Amino acid sequence: MDKASALTALRAHQAELKQLGVEHLFLFGSTARGVARDDSDVDFFFDHPLGSIGLLELIDVKAATSRVFGHPVDVMTRRSLHPILREAIESSAVQVF
């Protein structure tokens, strides 16, 4: 999926994702860079209110974004980004909402 299509699809589901606790959603990785292949997964990280997300809520966000694309996604919170990779990921990320 190309970057523009991914952004459009995600923005169409903004209300649903916000109900799941997603305050801000960011696209990163090959889709954000415009180099995704047909077999590429789609990578996201998101911000949420502190203390409001647990494993089950994270699974719900992953399931919701996976339904948007119909194939695998990687979803994580901003706080869970690896410290060594965080700066590179954040600098290349595209804010969805």
Would you name each region that the model predicts?
Residues M1-H24, R33-D38, L50-F97:
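Catalytic core of pol beta-like nucleotidyltransferases
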Residues F28, F45-D47:
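Short hydrophobic/aromatic beta-strand micro-patches
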Residues D38-D39, F44:
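A short, structured beta-strand/loop element
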Residues F44-F45, F69:
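General secondary-structure edge motif
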